Amino acid sequence: MKSISRLRLVILLLPTLLLLPRIDAIFNATMPRKALGESLLLLLCGWAISRLCPWQRMTSHASSAVLAATLLFLFWMIPRSIDLTQIYPSANALYVVSLFAVGFLLSHYWPMLPGVARVAYGLYFSSMIVAFGLLYAAQSTLLCSAYTLEEQHAFGWMLVPLGLGVYLLVLAFMTRWLVKPIESQ
């Protein structure tokens, strides 16, 4: 029990550590680190704290919570939003807190959605990741003023395989969900 409470404390402190100037500078050095590395780390921290803390879940809030999490995530993928995290420390703090909340909400409420809704959402979300990746990779103009065009292209080409991988995972889940096991037939 004591080790779980220590683990909770470490997970809760990790987003705070990301706001320290030296650690923040490491993630802000390149666009892939900021928009992909830090984002995934915050999503994982939110997911982990949701799994370690027993919260009461309300099924009626599941679709709203997943929608809110999606909109928050997509907001921080917009180039102007990424620029704001570089210019204003308060926007960076909001970025950290909101992506932590996105991980928490998705981990907490995703399992409560019906199977078909999870599949549809997963296919849509992974397609949006691929679309953002292609947008960043194919643009010959600078979308994010805080980073170089090369970093923007690198970030875009990292998002494309990530989105395609998530898409394949969702399809694998869908086939498992649609096809009944042989033993139960």
Residues covered by each model-derived region:
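Alpha-helical membrane segments of multi-pass proteins
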Residues: 1-185
